[in-house]
């Protein structure tokens, strides 16, 4: 799964901009590179929790940085755990343990229960 770009600017209302073509000097068109972001997902969650609340582009950028940071921390810890146990695959068990190690108390419990729920939903939909 490709990792989103680190310095991705947040688009308004959490949507990605379409790839626009930029005119070059010799007449050929060059595609503008896409900036990956968690903005659309942050926006969807915001609307689930507070339907009447908006988010500024600066706040969206901060949320995007936060999600990237947490993703890297969990992935790094899960990688270390797999390495310690001489495993070459990161499973949901490593992710769960990494979350328990990284997040404090009640937050870890909620994250683990939500993660378990998501994995169950995914496997039942297959």
Curated annotation (Swiss-Prot):
Source taxon at top rank: Eukaryota
Encoding gene, per UniProt annotation: histh2b
Classification lineage: Eukaryota, Metazoa, Chordata, Craniata, Vertebrata
Modification type N6-acetyllysine: residues: 6, 13, 16, 21
Tissue: Expressed by the skin granular glands.
One Pfam short name: Histone
InterPro entries from the UniProt entry: Histone-fold, Histone_H2A/H2B/H3, Histone_H2B, HISTONE_H2B_site
Protein name per Swiss-Prot or TrEMBL: Histone H2B
Post-translational modification: Monoubiquitination of Lys-121 by BRE1 gives a specific tag for epigenetic transcriptional activation and is also prerequisite for histone H3 'Lys-4' and 'Lys-79' methylation.
Species of provenance: Zhangixalus schlegelii
Gene Ontology CC terms: extracellular region; nucleosome; nucleus
Glycan attachment points: 113
């Amino acid at each position: 799964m490709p990792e989103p770009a680190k310095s991705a600017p947040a688009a308004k209302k959490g949507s990605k901009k379409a790839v626009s073509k930029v005119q070059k000097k010799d007449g050929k068109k060059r595609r503008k590179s896409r900036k990956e972001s968690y903005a659309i997902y942050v926006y969807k969650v915001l609307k689930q929790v507070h339907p009447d609340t908006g988010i500024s582009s600066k706040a969206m950028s901060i949320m995007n940085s936060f999600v990237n940071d947490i993703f890297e921390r969990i992935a790094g810890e899960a990688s270390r755990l797999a390495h310690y146990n001489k495993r070459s695959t990161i499973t949901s068990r490593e992710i769960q343990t990494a979350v328990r190690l990284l997040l404090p108390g009640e937050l870890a419990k909620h994250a683990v229960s939500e993660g378990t729920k998501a994995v169950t939903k995914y496997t039942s939909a297959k």
